[in-house]
Amino acid sequence: MSLTLRVLAPDQSVFDGSADEVILPSTTGQLGILPGHVSLLAALDVGVLRVRADGGWKSIALMGGFAEVDADDVTVLVNSAELGSSIDASSAESDLQAARNEVSKMEGQPASADKVKAQQSLDRARARVQAAKNQD
């Protein structure tokens, strides 16, 4: 018994296949999905979706969205996503360092749209690095 997982972004189908287990980065924490899971809708945060299939794990960097679980079908609708295997780890690390520098420059400043954007960039860069490094 397995799950059918579809990860869909506005411009592409990122993943469409079978999975033995899915771990979603929900806004309330990690959410594990196994075959036979109860139906649910969940808001997703920026983070890494993990897929166990064919005896190994795949990672997908998600940039927020929603997940629907219905019987053994999992549909993930996201703003943007990248397979970890398609992310250049060294480039992602450079982006992460640049985002950290930008956030640190804004330490102590009052809340602003620029500060929020810098934090969001840091979260996205962190997710990309984690997805690139967590390929089995």
From Swiss-Prot:
Gene3D superfamilies, per the entry: F0F1 ATP synthase delta/epsilon subunit, N-terminal, Helix hairpin bin
Recorded topology in the membrane: Peripheral membrane protein
Region spans: Disordered: 88-136
Principal subcellular localization: membrane
Cellular compartment(s): Cellular thylakoid membrane
GO molecular function, one term: ATP binding
Source superkingdom: Bacteria
GO CC annotations on file: plasma membrane-derived thylakoid membrane; proton-transporting ATP synthase complex
CDD domains found in the cross-reference section: F1-ATPase_delta
Keyword list, A-Z: ATP synthesis, CF(1), Hydrogen ion transport, Ion transport, Membrane, Thylakoid, Transport
UniProt cross-references to InterPro entries, sorted A to Z: ATP_synth_F1_dsu/esu (IPR001469), ATP_synth_F1_dsu/esu_N (IPR020546), ATP_synth_F1_esu_C (IPR020547), ATPsynth_dsu/esu_N (IPR036771)
Pfam families xref list: ATP-synt_DE (PF00401), ATP-synt_DE_N (PF02823)
Biological function: Produces ATP from ADP in the presence of a proton gradient across the membrane.
Subunit structure: F-type ATPases have 2 components, CF(1) - the catalytic core - and CF(0) - the membrane proton channel. CF(1) has five subunits: alpha(3), beta(3), gamma(1), delta(1), epsilon(1). CF(0) has three main subunits: a, b and c.
Family as reported in the entry's similarity comment: Belongs to the ATPase epsilon chain family.
PANTHER family (alphabetical): ATP SYNTHASE DELTA/EPSILON CHAIN, ATP SYNTHASE EPSILON CHAIN, CHLOROPLASTIC
Full protein name: ATP synthase epsilon chain
